Structure formats: C-alpha cells, structure tokens
C-alpha cells in the first residue's frame, strides 16, 4: 500500500475506557457534591414517595419477598431501593461518588457503564428498576431489550421505572416558541407516551402506568390522553415474553 493511501494509525488514541471515563466525569461534574452534598440522598418532591409505594404494591402483588433479587440500574445513592425494600436489591451506576453513598446506605453495588449493555448473565434477576434512567441513554430500545434479557422469564418477574414525557402540550408549545423540549442537558432521549408504551408492551405481557404529574394526573376522571396531558410517568411491567422477536428500529412515533 502506498504511503498516500495508508491510514495514519499512529494518530489513534490507545485509551479503551476513555468514553466510560468521560461520561463518569460528566455526571460527577453535574452532581458537584461540594456544592450540593445531599445530591445523592435528597428526596425532592413527592414523586419518589408515590413511585416507591406504587412499585412496592406491584411487587407484593406478584409475590416478591426477600427471596427475590432486584437490580437497580442507575442506583445513585441507593435511596429508592431502600425505600422500596421488600426484596434483596443490588445496584449499578457509572458515578463513583454515588456508589460510595449507596454502599454507606447498605446497598451492594458496583460501577458499570450501561449506556449500551447491562453486563449480567441471562435470567439473573426477579426485578429490574430503571428510575429516571432511560431518558439519559441514547438507545432506550437496546436498554429495555437488555432488561428483558437479564430478567427471569416468570409471570411475576417485574420491570419498574419512570421517565419524563416530553411531548405533552406544554412542551409542544415551548417548541413552537423556539425552545428545546427539555432544558436538561443530561436528557438525550425524549419520550412520547406512545413510544414508551409500545416499547414496554413489545417485551412484557402486563403493563400498568401511574401518571406522576400533568393534567391527567390531577384530574384522573377526565380520562385525558397520556400522550398530551402527562409530564412524568411511572410503570410496572410483568410477565416478560418468552420470545418477543425483534424490535422494529424503523418504527416512527
């Protein structure tokens, strides 16, 4: 091969974990625990209390107890796993500072970059939780597929979590005025309810939702569209499908 056509391999950076490190540093800078020391432990608002009650009732309904093993993906300081209790929880997170807080709270946890893969064996867990996590990941469809893979294929096996919904009327009005759907820099995926619902029902036979904020949450009797009138939503899904097939990545929402 002539010198003109040779790829300049000497320019390549030999740092395999560079992406992992950059993401970890980004989250650590965002947390800035020197300025906000309670960042990993504070319970802000009522969402967490409402969600944990919802999750716990769902797990109790599906006969989970201390014999069940749960994975908290993006566990931060381990607060929600501690609030839910009921089962044996372990956690993973990319943020070292968060993991230190979680360990002090008694949650067994390790550092893991789950941006594209959740590195556990097939059928390892009875419960998986991704609370306010999917919106931070570039390909949620891959993450949910990984959740399905590591869950045991039992009727009571459960996947619980929550996300903001960014296509409600208020956010649409923001876009019409030239603003972003979300001002949160850490949010890289913006869910509509339709997308979330189709994704969860593709992998699970039983899905239940709990609106956390928005007009539909304040006025449940009005039976308003979740796609337009819910800002934040929690879910509990059970009965993972044994052979869900392949998710259509060309689907348009």
Identify the residue ranges that each predicted region occupies.
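Conserved N-terminal segment of class I S-adenosyl-L-methionine
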Residues: 1-121, 127, 141-144, 161, ...
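Conserved catalytic-core motifs of eukaryotic protein kinase domains, centered on the activation segment
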Residues: 139-140, 172
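Conserved class I S-adenosyl-L-methionine
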Residues: 158-183
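A conserved catalytic-core signature of glycosyltransferases
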Residues: 168, 186, 191
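A short beta-strand submotif of the Rossmann-like class I SAM-dependent methyltransferase core
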Residues: 127-133
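A short glycine-rich, Lys/Arg-flanked "PGG" loop and its adjoining helix->strand segment in the class I
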Residues: 141-157
